[in-house]
């Protein structure tokens, strides 16, 4: 069928007619991968199924071109007539083609980046979607912004970006698939290399087909929900694959960039430029599956992994350092070690006999290797049986012990004139030790403030001094402070404990038992008052935590954000607390709940103001404040292009120290592959440096006044629909797959805080996820149109002020650009399909009204931004979205009709005979359908639905 063949390529070329630039290979990459995939589909399932998939694709592509909704109906009736086995294969095919399109994009982006670096052409760096290159940033600071080189070097040395990995319910892709995707990317990259021979090409092509087929034949659906340990292992796999080697490579690039602006020094290995933390196994907020045992396991697991990673590199280092010249200080140490160790260690692969004394560096490193071996084994024993026969003295217990012999080698090499050798693998190794430590990542603990209140309440009740929960804030503070200043223990083993109390105290006991370098911060969610922070300080002391964790209040809801500065000021006015914190405090601000509460515009503005106020308070008390940004991956939950988001923060709020959460669903796009990892580290570093040295402007008073007014109108409009419209919840539940979302086995956390209840009790994640699935994105734009309309009706000249804000004020610019990106991905026509099929007759008009509101908001946005068309400023993104859309449309239609069949068993469909050659024997049950044993729906429906959810999530990218 050659003419069909052309058709899918031709459709791809029609969708993105002009090349965006001469190095643009995206359409080529995409067509190659899709062609390979369709050939595989035909081999496995026969020509009829392949033809069916192509027809669906064509209908979708035609709809994308002419927006004729009749085509969607035609597509729907085609899809509903499929038998269960076929419908799973078709949904899975589209989901895979989308994944392949994403891989083609990643390769194209990395490729374009390399070409730009070669040419040194950064003309479009100023536009939103491109990211800042570290060398360009350094050069710009020195040449254009008049900073001295030393200032820049100093700022870099003292800057810290702490990336906090969180497990995430919508990391929709299984690890088994992530690895296959990595290999597909590599094949694609090599296939287009300049110096490739015909044989190479043939072998790569075979490898590519093999990997695509392996991915397609893997069950994409998790059949059991992941445990927190699974989530943690998934997160840690990125360290193995890319981050471990990526960090020293990146730091080396910074050395090069510094050299190129005339600094002839390397970045010291103990400069804390990048750090990694994690919430996986530490975040208990609303997740009953994270117990004290889980936390202990996760810490030991990370320590074991770290020791193993160092261990795997130490022999290479021993090979490299074969010199015999060394300093006296090192010679003495080597002789001591040589005399004391006499046995041969046969379980090592290299250097298993005793190292001769004329290789002093190897003697020293041999001892380090022994200690690493024992460190790893001890963690392994503790993890599997809780006890270990290896004494603690034989292992590394803190990072200083580990650094000391390595620093000794470094000093000695430099003293003997071998500095170039010292700056090789040894420097990389030192940097790894400094960045990752013995624990690989620092684990944060997060718990709700009410749980601490309950524990203290049971203590005060037990002591017979009243009920802590009923006391006023003043009384709580007085009691907590008198206890903190006193010395006596609060409770003994006779304290009556409920399951909840035992869980909270158990966590503190784990903090006391494990080495202090395992942990980062103790975060209190729903924190409102100083007593919330003091309570954690007291519990840490009572449970004998030797080096108490820093306590970080988290402010999320709109009202909490408004009250945050006052609460922090009250905290700083307590002398005991000021003595405890040593001039440093961290505050976390959460994006997702504030957005669900009041809509995106008001939440973003409230965040901005809260940060400004918090910084003022901290300055007044002489405290260095670190902001911890809890951003989601989606725009509705604070996501968006990294460097832009950083540069749009208020001036003075970052000051060279930034903590940001990297959500599960974004980890893959940020660290999934070497080049991506490099780019992510570069983006965060460059943007943080630039924000500190060249802060964005403060908004003019009239801009502030306008924003305040707009936020009030936007919140009112948002709440009038989401919270006050009596039938909104009913509409939301029927127009989106929210009810079915919980079946996806995506994360270890329940999707509701409380089983019954309306929008309030829904977690922010499913709320956003559901609207992204139908491509209506309601929480992101709702309220925005009303606000702009109100401002323009009040005074027609305000449009000029808004345009000025858009052009001059990064915060406003970013807020609008993200909105524009969401409009580019949205499609009310698709949302209408869901409405027609799933929403009750008398609610249809409500949906129509919302869609009208959507179109109006979009027009107003374009007017303010001065664009004729969505995304006209970003041709690259526009092209990528066009290529993805046709796949997503088919999945949307398939999802809407599948939901209809699940919810309305009487819905009439006319079944066809099976298309796939795998399922032609009708007497046999289809194996593919039997993978799902538990489904309560008709065969095949649940899996088809889950596949469409995953596919759409992959297509929208910043979804989850």
From Swiss-Prot:
Transmembrane segments: none annotated. It is an enzyme of class 4 (lyase). Its cofactor is Mg(2+). Pfam families: PEPcase. The modification Phosphoserine is found at residue 7. It catalyses: oxaloacetate + phosphate = phosphoenolpyruvate + hydrogencarbonate. It is found in: Cytoplasm. Belongs to the PEPCase type 1 family. This is Phosphoenolpyruvate carboxylase 1. The lineage of its organism: Eukaryota, Viridiplantae, Streptophyta, Embryophyta, Tracheophyta.
């Amino acid at each position: 069928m050659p003419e069909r063949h052309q058709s899918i390529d031709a459709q791809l070329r029609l969708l993105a007619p002009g090349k965006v630039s001469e190095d643009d290979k995206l359409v080529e990459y995409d067509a190659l991968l899709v062609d390979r995939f369709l050939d595989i589909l035909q081999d496995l399932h026969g020509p009829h199924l392949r033809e069916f998939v192509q027809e669906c694709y064509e209908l979708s592509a035609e709809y994308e071109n002419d927006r004729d909704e009749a085509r969607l109906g035609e597509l729907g009736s085609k899809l509903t007539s499929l038998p269960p086995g076929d419908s799973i294969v078709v949904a899975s095919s589209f989901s895979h083609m989308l994944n392949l399109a994403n891989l083609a994009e990643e390769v194209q982006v990395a490729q374009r980046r390399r070409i730009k670096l070669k040419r040194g052409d950064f003309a479009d760096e100023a536009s939103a979607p491109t990211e800042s290159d570290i060398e360009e940033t350094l050069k710009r600071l020195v040449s254009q912004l008049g900073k001295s080189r030393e200032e820049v070097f100093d700022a870099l040395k003292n800057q810290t970006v702490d990336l906090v990995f969180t497990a995430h319910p919508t990391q929709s892709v299984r690890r088994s698939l992530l690895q296959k995707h990595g290999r597909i990317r590599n094949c694609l990259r090599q296939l287009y290399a300049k110096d490739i021979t015909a044989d190479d090409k043939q072998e790569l092509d075979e490898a590519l087909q093999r990997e695509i087929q392996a991915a397609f034949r893997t069950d994409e659906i998790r059949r059991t929900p992941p445990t927190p340990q699974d989530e943690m292992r998934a997160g840690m796999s990125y360290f193995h694959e890319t981050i471990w080697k990526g960090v020293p490579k990146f730091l080396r690039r910074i050395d090069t960039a510094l050299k190129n602006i005339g600094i002839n020094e390397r970045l010291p290995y103990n400069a804390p430029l990048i750090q990694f933390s994690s919430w996986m196994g530490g975040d208990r907020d609303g997740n009953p599956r994270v117990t004290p045992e889980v936390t202990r396991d996760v810490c030991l697991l990370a320590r074991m992994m770290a020791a193993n990673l160092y261990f795997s590199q130490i022999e290479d280092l021993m090979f490299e350092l074969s010199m015999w010249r060394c300093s006296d200080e090192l010679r003495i140490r080597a002789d001591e070690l040589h005399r004391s160790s006499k046995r041969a260690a046969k379980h090592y692969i290299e250097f298993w006999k005793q190292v001769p004394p004329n290789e002093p560096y190897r003697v020293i490193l041999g001892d380090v290797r022994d200690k690493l071996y024992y460190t790893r084994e001890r963690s392994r024993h503790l993890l599997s049986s809780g006890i270990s026969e290896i004494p603690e003295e034989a292992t590394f217990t803190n990072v200083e012990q580990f650094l000391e012999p390595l620093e000794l080698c470094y000093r000695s090499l430099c003293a003997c004139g071998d500095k170039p050798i010292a700056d090789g693998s040894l420097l990389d190794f030192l940097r790894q030790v400094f960045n990752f430590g013995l624990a690989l990542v620092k684990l944060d603990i997060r718990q709700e403030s009410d749980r601490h209140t309950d524990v203290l309440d049971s203590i005060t009740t037990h002591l017979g001094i009243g009920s802590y929960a009923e006391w006023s804030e003043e009384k709580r503070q007085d009691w907590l402070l008198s206890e903190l200043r006193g010395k006596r223990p609060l409770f003994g083993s006779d304290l009556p404990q409920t399951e909840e109390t035992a869980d909270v105290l158990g966590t503190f006991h784990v903090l006391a038992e494990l080495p202090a370098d395992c942990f980062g911060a103790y975060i209190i969610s729903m924190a409102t008052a100083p007593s919330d922070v003091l309570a954690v300080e007291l519990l840490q002391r009572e449970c004998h935590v030797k080096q108490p964790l820093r306590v970080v209040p988290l402010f999320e809801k709109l009202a909490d954000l408004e009250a945050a500065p006052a609460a922090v000021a009250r905290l700083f006015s307590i002398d005991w607390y000021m003595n405890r914190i040593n001039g440093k405090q961290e505050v976390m601000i959460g994006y997702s709940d504030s957005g669900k509460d009041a809509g995106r515009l008001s939440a973003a503005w409230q965040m901005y103001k809260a940060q400004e106020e918090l910084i003022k308070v901290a300055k007044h008390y002489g405290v260095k404040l670190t902001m911890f940004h809890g951003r989601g991956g989606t725009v509705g939950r604070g996501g968006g292009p990294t460097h832009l988001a950083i540069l749009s923060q208020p001036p003075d709020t970052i000051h060279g120290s930034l903590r940001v959460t990297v959500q599960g669903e974004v980890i893959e796009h940020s660290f999934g592959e070497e080049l991506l990892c490099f780019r992510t580290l570069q983006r965060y570093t460059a943007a943080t440096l630039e924000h500190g040295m060249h802060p964005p402007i403060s908004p003019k008073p009239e801009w502030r006044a306008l924003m305040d007014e707009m936020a009030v109108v936007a919140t009112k409009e948002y709440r009038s629909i989401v919270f006050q419209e009596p039938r909104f919840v009913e509409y939301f539940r029927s127009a989106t797959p929210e009810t079915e979302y919980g079946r996806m086995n995506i994360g270890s956390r329940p999707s509701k805080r409380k089983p019954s209840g309306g929008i309030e009790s829904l977690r922010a994640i499913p709320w956003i996820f559901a609207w992204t699935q139908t491509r209506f994105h309601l929480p992101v734009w709702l309220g925005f149109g009303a606000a702009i309309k109100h401002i323009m009706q009040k005074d027609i000249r305000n449009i000029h002020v808004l345009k000025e804000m858009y052009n001059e004020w990064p915060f406003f610019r970013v807020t609008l650009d993200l909105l524009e990106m969401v409009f580019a991905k949205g499609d009310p026509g698709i949302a209408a399909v869901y409405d027609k099929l799933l929403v009750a007759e008398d609610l249809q008009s409500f949906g129509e009204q919302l869609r009208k509101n959507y179109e109006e908001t979009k027009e107003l946005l374009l007017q303010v931004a001065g664009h004729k068309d969505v995304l006209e400023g970003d041709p690259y993104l526009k092209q990528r979205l066009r290529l993805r859309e046709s796949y997503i449309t088919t999945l949307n239609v398939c999802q809407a009709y599948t939901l209809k069949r699940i919810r309305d068993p009487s819905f009439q469909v006319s079944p066809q005979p099976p298309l796939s050659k795998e399922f032609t024997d009708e007497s046999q049950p289809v194996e593919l359908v039997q993978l799902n044993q538990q489904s309560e729906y008709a065969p095949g429906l649940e899996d088809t639905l889950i596949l469409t959810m995953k596919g759409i999530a992959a297509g929208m990218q910043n979804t989850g």
